[in-house]
Every structure is written in C-alpha cells, then in structure tokens.
Amino acid sequence: SEPTQKGKVKILEELVNSYLLKDVLTLADVKGSKILTSILKLLAFQVGSQVSLNEVANSVNIDVKTVQRYLDLLEKAFVIVSLEGFSRNLRSEVTSKAKYYFLDNGIRNGIIQQFNKIDLRDDIGKLWENFLFIERLKYRTYKNIYSNRYFWRTYSQQEIDLVEDRDGKLQAFEYKWSEKRK
C-alpha cells in the first residue's frame, strides 16, 4: 500500500539520519555531525544561489578549509554537486562563489524539515531549479554526453542557471517555476 504523508516524512528523516549523518561521517572519519547538519542546512536554503564559504564557515564557527573538506566529502558521497561560475570577462562577470545542488530534493527537504505540499511552499523556485539541474545531469550521464558545467552571472545581476561547454560549443538553460523575471 502507498505510504501516508507521515510515513513518507518518516522515511526521509530516517534516510537523512542514517545515510547522511552516520554513513557519510563514518566514511570520512568525521566526528562533527552537528557541523555537517549545519552546513547541509545552509546549503539547502541556498540551493541555486551562490554560496560564500566564508559565510558558511562563520555561521558554523569553523575555518574555511574545514568547510571545503566537508563539501568535498558531500560531493564524493553523492549528496551535493557544485557548479562553478563561467566567465570570459572577469571584470563584469561573477565567478568566485559556487552554487550547490542536492542530488535528491527529498534529502534536501528532510534536512530542513520542509514537507509541505508544493502550493504551500515559498521555496518552489529553488526546488524546481534543483530538480531540473539534477535531471539534466542524470540525462547527460545516462547518454554519456560529457561537458563542463557552469552558471553565468554578471555583477548587474543578469544570470543563466546552467551553461554547458562541450568542445567549445555553449548551451544555456534558465530554470523558472513562474513567468516572473528577477
């Protein structure tokens, strides 16, 4: 039988607590589950946005190198994937901060304890962007189509969510839940 909403939430919570907080920590011989949880929450609330590692480090009260180590661990454990900035003109384009996406929106929701239905959520745009980015990644992996992936943003706030560079040929994607433009 189909699990109830409460049953689904319980499954996600168990996944987050067992897979993320036990397996990932054991894998890297890391002791700080509170630190890992805090970093994951910060990333979850910033999906699709550029993330300042200095801000994350200050928020969790650790040094930037430790944050980088945790992020590397989370990427190797297939929890998150990073996206660097694309630039051909460093004076007008932002490249210093990466974006992070979760390979599973359910895990993201479990981390921040957000299980409301779509029409009751204020983060639907972030969920949509995360979903489409990951589906694109899975599709290209399945088809063995490899390219460098970036986002593009100018200091005047113009942005493209995903730029794929394959053999010098660029392809751009913008993910919007609603027709409203930023």
Language-model-detected regions and their locations in the chain:
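A cross-kingdom feature that marks ATP-driven nucleic-acid transaction machinery
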Residues: 69-79, 83-182
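A short alpha-helical element within helix-turn-helix/winged-helix DNA-binding domains
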Residues: 50, 55-58
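Interdomain motor-coupling "hinge/lid" segment immediately C-terminal to the ATP-binding subdomain
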Residues: 1-45, 49-50
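Conserved short-loop catalytic and cofactor-binding motifs
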Residues: 27, 55, 120
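Residues in the helix-turn-helix
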Residues: 66
